[in-house]
C-alpha cells in the first residue's frame, strides 16, 4: 500500500448519528496533516442524511476535494445519497480490506462509514487505508467507465445547478397540469 496521499484535501460530513465519530476522525486527520473541509453538521441535533450526501458529492464533483468521508448510522443512507451523482463512487466499508479494495478496484472517492456499527479504532484504520491506497487502474478503468455510461443512459438529467433543477421541476409541473391545444 502506497502512502503518497498525505497532501490530500478531504471533505468530511455526517448526519446526527455519525456526528461524534465524524468529530474524532476529523481531529485525527488534522493531526496527521490532511487538509480537512468539514461540511457539517456542527452538532448532534437531528438532520437529514440526503442533504449531507449531496453536499459531499458536490465537493467531489466540483474538484474542491480529492476524497470524502461520510458517516451516518449505518453508512447506507449517506452512501446511497452520494452515489446519485455522476462521477461519485461512495463505498460503504467496515474494515481495512474493504476500504483498500474500494480504492484499488473501484477508485472510490467517498468512504461511507456506519457510525453505529464500528468503533473509533476500526474506523480510523478504514479511513487510513482508504486515504493511503491508490487506484490500480488497468482493467478496472473500463468497468468504471461502464458504470458512468450506464448511469448516464438510464438516468434523468444529473445537475448540481439548483436553478436549473427548479426550472425543470416547474416545467414538468406545468406540462402535467396544463392542457395544450
Where are these regions (language model features)?
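Glycine-rich phosphate/diphosphate-binding loop of Rossmann-like nucleotide-binding domains
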Residues: 11-31
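A short beta-strand-loop structural module common to alpha/beta enzyme folds
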Residues: 35-46
